[in-house]
Amino acid sequence: MQRHAYICDAVRTPFGRYGGALSGVRADDLGAVPLAALMARHPGVDWQAVSDVIFGCANQAGEDNRNVARMSALLAGLPLEVPGATVNRLCGSGLDALGTAARAIKSGEAGLMIAGGVESMSRAPFVMPKAESAFSRSNAIYDTTIGWRFVNKLMKAQYGVDSMPETAENVAVEYKIEREAQDRMALSSQLKAVAAQKAGHLAREIVGVSIPQKKGDAILVDQDEHPRETSLEALA
């Protein structure tokens, strides 16, 4: 008989803007924050019983490149015996981590899992490939913030290598989604997010991130930076 999988608790850090308040925080340190908060919130849990920590991460080009799930688990203070694995399904990475954890529990392979994801586009590095020949004078540099890098020419010729924003534009053209309709949807989403934030609906799930300052006390970032007041005129 297949077992059921349940979400027992959920915590996260605030969503930060590109180059915003969280831009100075490494991805592995950021991933450790909710893990440490989860442990503090449930002191009665035997954390050695955790079968695995599964994190999704799409970039993996910089400070998040060496199995960031394991790095975050160690930094958070989870027992050394608890393993970690990082999955990459690009924008669906975090949700894929959740699915992987649920399947492990339902199959009987695991009893207690931690699943989530971490990303820092602000700290995505510029990268350079090695020269293909000795004393080569050619060079290339890739911004790993979003989209492809080290493009396979055969892949590009066969499928294209558009980034997610470019794909969104292509889909809008193909399905004749007018800009005004997109703006109305965006405005509705923003207004709901702002209302939820003001009402305090997100407070329980958010763990504040302490940002050290060169002078004075550290700043606690405990609200999403993304939701903001806007209008159809501003979006047009």
Predicted regions and their residues:
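N-terminal extracellular/periplasmic Venus flytrap/periplasmic-binding protein-like
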Residues: 12-13, 24-33, 44, 181-236
